[in-house]
Structure formats: structure tokens, C-alpha cells
Amino acid sequence: MDLMLNGKRALVTGGSKGIGRAIARQLALEGVDVVIAARNQAELDAAAAELAQETGRKIVGLAVDTQDDVSVKAVVAGTIAALGGLDILVNAAAKPGGQATPPKLAEITDALFFDDVNVKVMGYLRMAREAAPVMAAGGWGRIINISGLAVRLTGSTIGSIRNVAVAALTKNLADELGPQGINVTVVHPGTTRTEKTPGVVAARVAASGLAPEEVERRMAANVTIGRLVDMAEVADIVAFLASPRSVAINGDAIACGGGSKGAIHY
């Protein structure tokens, strides 16, 4: 299927590593020129050079702190200057979830909570607020928010709250921006294989004495496909949602964790 993405222009926050980088790569392979944005300029420069060499597309790394409105305005303006416009925004800049033991109620300080929400929820809102008028002026756009399956699970109070908030933000934006040609969706990855996974597995092997294969099997114990989803497979879904082919999907949530056992979502 031709996703009709050739020549589109995208901004991917959290794009220097992990799922964000995988999304930037897949978009570029589909013919999209991409700005990847994150905090560390050196990591951005290295990732941009590697992705440009692999895909043959224009890949630019721009530093951003999505907690700061001035920085957000600058990265959107920089994207327009670098690419000549902006058609697609992927919000993937967030504190990683699922790696450490989530804090219990007594351990959740105001600062911990608000810092996490400021990065993911307010950060996504700031980016959309700045990018949407550019897309509306062109009559077309896509905004994809990367959230996570903590939205449907207990066990991480902050993780669940922030991800539910991202889903609510997504639906509100979709209703407001849909008539202007801008579709907004939210994607919920589960535990996903990224470049960090081998290190996580090695640490658990050292702590438990289990074989690496058994550690990974346990990590995917509640995944119905029987293994972890790879970040490239998440990127495939996002590339479709970023395309004109996805016009029938707006304001909805797409889970891409390989299937959660037992739960029924409708």
C-alpha cells in the first residue's frame, strides 16, 4: 500500500532514540523529511546523520525542552525553516515508563507528579498548540500522541494518570481540529523492545540467574502474541496514522502492545 506520505514534513519529539527514533526512521523510509527533537543536541546530530544516510531523506536534529514554551515555539519555527512547512507532529518526548518500580502512594511527591505530567501531558499540549495553526493553514495535518498501556492498567499511579490525560487531550484536540483537516490519534505501546532492552534483560539475568530467553518470556507473559513488540512494529502503525490513508480514524486510541490477556476493550 502506498501511504501517500512522499514529500510530507514531520516533527518527532523524543526522536533521538527508542520508539521516537523508530518512528522517524519509518516516516523517512516512506518519503517524509523529518526533524527529530530532544534535549541532547549531540545525540540528535548522531541520530540525524545515521537516519539520513540510511533513508536518503532530509533529517534534521533540533534541541527542545517541551516543558518550556519558548523552546517549543523555537523548535516548531525551526522545523518550518528547515523543511519548508509542517504536516505531521508525533509527540513521543516523555519520561520512560515500565523500567523502574513505580512509586507507592506515600512516595509520590507533588514535584514528582507535576514533573512527569508537565513533560508528557503539558509537553504534548504545548507542541500541538504551536503546530496546529501551521497545519490548519495548509488544510491538512496529523498529530499522533505516544502514550502507553498504563492507561488501561493499575500499578503505576502517575503512569496511569498521565496516559489517561493524554488520551483525553487527544480526543479534545480531534474534535476541535478535525474540521480543519487535522486528525489526532493516540497510540498505546506496551513494554516494547528498544535499544535499551538488551541491557534490561542482562540486568535481570544477573539478578535472577535465569536464562535471557526466560527473562524475555516473563517480560511478555501477558502479551497474547507471546513476545515483546519491537519499536519498528510500533512505528509501522504510527506511519499509517500519519498518512492520508488514516482519514477514517480521528480521536481514537490504538493499542500496540501485542494484545493484553483477559481484558475486553470496545
Predicted segments with their positions:
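Short C-terminal tail/terminal secondary-structure segment
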Residues: 18-19, 102, 239, 250-266
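Catalytic loop of short-chain dehydrogenase/reductase
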Residues: 95-96, 110, 142-166, 170-179, ...
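Conserved mid-core segment of classical short-chain dehydrogenase/reductases
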Residues: 73, 94-114, 137, 158
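Catalytic Tyr-X3-Lys loop
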Residues: 106-126, 140, 144, 166
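Canonical Rossmann dinucleotide-binding motif of NAD(H)/NADP(H)-dependent dehydrogenases/reductases
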Residues: 3-35
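Short, small/polar-rich loop/turn modules that mediate ligand/substrate recognition or access, typified
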Residues: 178, 183, 249-251
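Amphipathic alpha-helical dimer-interface segment in Rossmann-like NAD(P)H-dependent oxidoreductases
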Residues: 119-137, 174-175, 243
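The beta1-alpha1 cofactor-binding region of Rossmann-like NAD(H)/NADP(H)-dependent oxidoreductases
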Residues: 41, 63-75, 110
